Structure formats: C-alpha cells, structure tokens
Amino acid sequence: MVLEVSDHQVLNDAEVAALLENFSSSYDYGENESDSCCTSPPCPQDFSLNFDRAFLPALYSLLFLLGLLGNGAVAAVLLSRRTALSSTDTFLLHLAVADTLLVLTLPLWAVDAAVQWVFGSGLCKVAGALFNINFYAGALLLACISFDRYLNIVHATQLYRRGPPARVTLTCLAVWGLCLLFALPDFIFLSAHHDERLNATHCQYNFPQVGRTALRVLQLVAGFLLPLLVMAYCYAHILAVLLVSRGQRRLRAMRLVVVVVVAFALCWTPYHLVVLVDILMDLGALARNCGRESRVDVAKSVTSGLGYMHCCLNPLLYAFVGVKFRERMWMLLLRLGCPNQRGLQRQPSSSRRDSSWSETSEASYSGL
C-alpha cells in the first residue's frame, strides 16, 4: 500500500494514444476497467482531487509532528532503562521505530497531494517502500506481541526468556526481512510519472491492472487480516484463561496490550473495508460507475488518514494506560533537567507496587 493519492497505474505512450483516439479507458487516475471501458470516457476526478488537496496535506503534517514526538518519547523511555529489555518491550521498541519511519514519509506524500511529486523517481521508490515496510511491520509486530503473551500465559512457556535476547532479536529481524520482501514491488514498479490529463507528476505504480489488484490483496491479507486473526485468537484464549483463574494481577498486566490491539483494529478496519470494495470493483464483482468511484476515492483518503492516526495513538495509550510508562517518562525528564520534582517524589511508591508483578512472566509490559 502506498498513499492513495499515488496508488495508480501508469499508461504507456501507446495506451495514452489509444485513450485519446477512442475516448476509452477507465482510470482511477486511470485504471477503471469494466465491460464498458471501450464505449465510455474516463470518469472526472475533480471532486476527489480537490478533496485530497484540501484534506491530506494538513492531516499528514499534523500526524508527522505528533507521531515523531510521541514515538520518539516511547523509544527514549525504553532505551533509558538500565536493565535489559523484556521481549515485549523489545517488540514495542521496534514498533515505535516502525511508526516513526512511517510518519517520516508523510511530508513527502503531503507535497504530492497538495501540488505534485517533485522529488524524482529514486525518492519515489524509497519513500513508497519505506512506507510499506513500516506499515506491514506495525501489524506483524503487534501479532508477535500477542503470540508472546499467548505462550507466556496460556501455555506458561517463557519462549523469549530461555534465550534472551537472541530469539526476540531474530524474530524482529525476520519481521523486518518479510516486510522488505513485501515492499519489493515498490522498488521495482514505483516511479515519478507525468500525467498529461492531470498536468501533474505523481509517484505512481507502473504495472498492469492485475498487478494492482494482487498488491491490494496482499496488503489486505498480510497487512491486516492475518495479524488481526492472530491477535484475536491469542487474546481470546488469554482472556479465557485469566477469567477462569481469576488472575486479577494478570488482567491488569494485559490491559495496555489489549487496548493497543483494539486501537489497531478500530483504526485500520474502515480503510481495509474500503480496499475490499475497491478490489471487488476491480474484479467485476461490484459494478463500477463514476459516482461510486468518486465515493470510494474520498473514502480511501478519509479512512487511510484514520489508519495513519494509529502511529500517533500508541504513545498516547502508553501515557494514559501504562502506569510504569508515566513513571519512567517522569524519571527521564528529571534526568534531562525537568524542574518539577514535586510530582516525581510521589512516583516510587507506585513503582514498588507494580514491580512485584511487572518483572515476572505475568506482565505484559515490564517497561510500560
């Protein structure tokens, strides 16, 4: 998945000539294939383009600032610990890195939406791949956290404690490697292309319609459905075990990680439902017309913005739900010269209260 403003296939010169001669094409920015493609002109994109110009730059700029500050704070808190990170904290650190790298690409896409792509094909490939790598990494790392908790609580298997930190490091490396593999189409097929109809240059895919559909299916399955199914399976079994055992201490330890997973589902489900509708239109299962195309384009812009908010939401969840995250943030600010020591003096009692379970296998977040 690349931002929707740039997710369009490119026509070669022969195809453009045929388009102009026969007034035949279907183009979601040029890719609206149907049985009537050869008898009807392409749909106008004025409404969706104007909406993107007004909506996306402001949203991406805000998410860039919030995501950079929030995830930077999470990484700083985790790295400030004097002891080794737990398995879950290590996954969370990688998740913060993934979210940070994703939001770093948003200013580029904001310029693309507001004006046009002015950064050349090389940066187009890098930005698209970087965006997709970290999109997939965020979902897969949450699935890893869920599976870690599942083994730890349901099966009482401390998988990553028996070989720390090698196993968790290898798991994270495997996740990043898989995400890099998923992003190969971006390195190969993305390029800066000047669209004569729009009189603008955009970062676009240059492959056939079937390639676009396949990429969307991959995004839907590998970037959303499979991770969500893993999370749902793991936490359903975890909650069942904890409710039967009445493990209130464990339930408290699970609170933050469950909230983070629920936030992932709420943020990304609307977007992927719209993607599913778009896939069905590509496959001909749903009729494609100009009104529906325009509504889908606008819906993709709005729901993708909601999905990107997830990158900024995690740090807020840590701050409001994670007691130990707040404590360590205050301690970090104190070391950096924060003058508000009165509030910090009240922290140790809470820290002692949590430490009895936060460093055991029952805890979800030893650092947060």
From Swiss-Prot:
Tissue-specificity statement: Isoform 1 and isoform 2 are mainly expressed in heart, kidney, liver and skeletal muscle. Isoform 1 is also expressed in placenta. Isoform 2 is expressed in endothelial cells. Expressed in T-cells (at protein level).
UniProt keyword list: Angiogenesis, Apoptosis, Cell membrane, Chemotaxis, Disulfide bond, G-protein coupled receptor, Glycoprotein, Membrane, Receptor, Sulfation, Transducer, Transmembrane, Transmembrane helix
Glycosylation sites: 22, 32
Positions with biased composition (Low complexity): 357-368
Disordered as annotated region, ranges: 342-368
Membrane topology, Cytoplasmic segments: 81-89, 148-169, 234-255, 322-368
CDD domains on file: 7tmA_CXCR3
Biological process (GO), any one: positive regulation of cytosolic calcium ion concentration
Cysteine disulfide partners in this protein: 124-203
Extracellular side: 1-53, 111-125, 190-212, 278-298
InterPro entries: CCR1-9-like, Chemokine_CXCR3, Chemokine_rcpt, GPCR_Rhodpsn, GPCR_Rhodpsn_7TM
Disulfide bond found in the keyword field: yes
Effect the entry attributes to changing residue 278 to A: Abolishes binding to CXCL10 and CXCL11 and CXCL11-induced chemotaxis. Reduces CXCL9 and CXCL10-induced chemotaxis
Transmembrane segments: 54-80, 90-110, 126-147, 170-189, 213-233, 256-277, 299-321
Coiled coil: none
Record note on what altering residue 293 to A does: Reduces binding to CXCL10 and CXCL9- and CXCL11-induced chemotaxis. Abolishes binding to CXCL11 and CXCL10-induced chemotaxis
Annotated positions of the Sulfotyrosine modification: 27, 29
GO MF annotation terms: C-C chemokine binding; C-C chemokine receptor activity; C-X-C chemokine binding; C-X-C chemokine receptor activity; chemokine binding; chemokine receptor activity; signaling receptor activity
Post-translational modification: Sulfation on Tyr-27 and Tyr-29 is essential for CXCL10 binding and subsequent signal transduction induction. N-glycosylated.
One of the record's GO cellular component terms: plasma membrane
Membership in a protein family: Belongs to the G-protein coupled receptor 1 family.
Quaternary context: Homomer. Forms heteromers with ACKR4.
The protein, known as: C-X-C chemokine receptor type 3
Gene: CXCR3
